[in-house]
C-alpha cells in the first residue's frame, strides 16, 4: 500500500484553491457534508490503489455486485467494454473491479473530473473533461488508449443518465468507442449496469438545466459522492453480453447508427 495521507482530501483547501481565500465558511461546511470528507478519509487512509482500491471501496460501502456473464469475457484479445452509465460513481468502480481483476489491472477507462479526483486510480482513469482545455487533447488521448495494449472500458454516453420528460434515460451514445474499436480491431463487450440515482439528483440536474447553471458546471455532479454514500448496502445487478466482433460494423449503417445499435443491445441485456 502507498503512503495513505497523500490520498486524503481537504475540502476547505480545495474550495479555497478554486474560489479564493475568502470562501465563506458555510460553503466549506456544506462541501464537507456533501462530500463526506471524514467518511472518505477513513477509507483513503487505508492506502489502497488500483484494482484493490475499487474492490475495497465497494466493500467499504457494503455494495454487492451480482455479475452475470463473466464466462463471456475473452482473455486472448483486445476488447472495448461498452457500458451504460446510470450512476456516475459505483458503476465506474464496478467496471474497474470486474475487468481489472480479469485483466491484471491492464485497463483504461475514460472518466470526468469527478472521478479523476480519485488519485488512487491514476493510470487506470484517463480524463475526458469537456470543460476547459483538456477537450483539445481528447483525440490524442483516445488514440493513445486504443492503440495501447490495455483493455478499454467506456461509458459512450459521456455522462450518467438524466431524467428526460419524466423518464430516466441514457444519453445518446457517441460513436468514438465504435470507430476506434474498428480501427484497432477490438471486439466490443456490451455491459448493462442496473441502477439509478435518487430523485433529488435528477431534480437538482433539472434546476441546473432551467437556470443555465449546467452550462458552466453540471450542478448535479456536486451530489455524486453523496449519492454513493446514500447507496451503501445496495446490491446491483450487472449483465455482460456476448462479445460483438468488430467486423460486424460494416457499411450498411453509419458509425453513429451502429453506436445506437450497440446501445440498444446493452439496454436489452
Q: What spans do the regions from the language model cover?
A:
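Membrane-anchoring hydrophobic helices of lipid-metabolizing enzymes
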Residues: 1-79, 85, 90-94, 104, ...
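Non-catalytic C-terminal accessory region of glycerolipid acyltransferases
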Residues: 2-7, 11, 138-269
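Structural motif
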Residues: 80-82, 125, 153-155
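"Short basic amphipathic alpha-helical interaction patches in structured regions
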Residues: 93-99, 167-168
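Short, surface-exposed basic-aromatic patches at helix termini and helix-loop junctions that form
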Residues: 96-102, 181-183
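Conserved nucleotide-cofactor-binding alpha/beta core module
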Residues: 101-135, 139-147
Amino acid at each position: 500500500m502507498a503512503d495513505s495521507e497523500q490520498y486524503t482530501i481537504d475540502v476547505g483547501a480545495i474550495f479555497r484553491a478554486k474560489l479564493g481565500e475568502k470562501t465563506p465558511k458555510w460553503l466549506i461546511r456544506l462541501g464537507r457534508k456533501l462530500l463526506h470528507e471524514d467518511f472518505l478519509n477513513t477509507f483513503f487512509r487505508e492506502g489502497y490503489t488500483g484494482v484493490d482500491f475499487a474492490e475495497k471501496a465497494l466493500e467499504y460501502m457494503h455494495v454487492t455486485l451480482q455479475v452475470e456473464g463473466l464466462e463471456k469475457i475473452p482473455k486472448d484479445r483486445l476488447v472495448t467494454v461498452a457500458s451504460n452509465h446510470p450512476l456516475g460513481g459505483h458503476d465506474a468502480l464496478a467496471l474497474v473491479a470486474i475487468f481489472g481483476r480479469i485483466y491484471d489491472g491492464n485497463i483504461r477507462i475514460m472518466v470526468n473530473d469527478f472521478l479523476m479526483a480519485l488519485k488512487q486510480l491514476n493510470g487506470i482513469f484517463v480524463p475526458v473533461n469537456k470543460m476547459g482545455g483538456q477537450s483539445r487533447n481528447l483525440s490524442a488521448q483516445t488514440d493513445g488508449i486504443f492503440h495501447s495494449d490495455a483493455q478499454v472500458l467506456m461509458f459512450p454516453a459521456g455522462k450518467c443518465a438524466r431524467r428526460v420528460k419524466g423518464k430516466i434515460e441514457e444519453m445518446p451514445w457517441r460513436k468514438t468507442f465504435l470507430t476506434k474499436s474498428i480501427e484497432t480491431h477490438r471486439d466490443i463487450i456490451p455491459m448493462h449496469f442496473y441502477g439509478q440515482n435518487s430523485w433529488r439528483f435528477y431534480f437538482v440536474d433539472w434546476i441546473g438545466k432551467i437556470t443555465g447553471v449546467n452550462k458552466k458546471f453540471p450542478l448535479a455532479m456536486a451530489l455524486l459522492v453523496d449519492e454513493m454514500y446514500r447507496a451503501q448496502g445496495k446490491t446491483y445487478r450487472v449483465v455482460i453480453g456476448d462479445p460483438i466482433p468488430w467486423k460486424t460494423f460494416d457499411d450498411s449503417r453509419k458509425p453513429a447508427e451502429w453506436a445506437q445499435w450497440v446501445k440498444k443491445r446493452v439496454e436489452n441485456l
